[in-house]
């Protein structure tokens, strides 16, 4: 049976009201075992300041962002199950959910699904890549019992 090992790091000034570790685990399990037998993923939930700093350092964008994905590149000749790290910004996720009229839990789930697909090598820079990635995200979100996260864009 496929297994995803989760290292959850809650690094917000106030960690109350965040999803439970079991929810993060469920969301990861909905994505990664489809592609990989065994994996280890770190999810770090942060405040805007840390997200801003990381986004500026690694993407050159001077603002916080919802989710950053840092895939782990296994050195040649080594076998490791470490897939990578997701850094999710609490304030951005909460603000986006409110602005987009989405249930907060569903938006958290979407950020984990979206970030996990990035760790697995999916991207959305080119239109065809974006369509493939969004279709996978939608399929996974529906399987989890949530709405299509892109439904507003399709209407």
Swiss-Prot record:
Keywords: Cytoplasm, Endonuclease, Hydrolase, Metal-binding, Nuclease, Ribosome biogenesis, rRNA processing, Zinc. One of its GO terms (biological process) is rRNA processing. GO terms for cellular component: cytoplasm. Its EC number is 3.1.-.-. The keyword Hydrolase applies. Binds 1 zinc ion. One of its GO terms (molecular function) is zinc ion binding. Its main location: cytoplasm. Its cofactor is Zn(2+). Single strand-specific metallo-endoribonuclease involved in late-stage 70S ribosome quality control and in maturation of the 3' terminus of the 16S rRNA. HAMAP family: Endoribonucl_YbeY. This is Endoribonuclease YbeY. It comes from Escherichia coli O7:K1 (strain IAI39 / ExPEC).
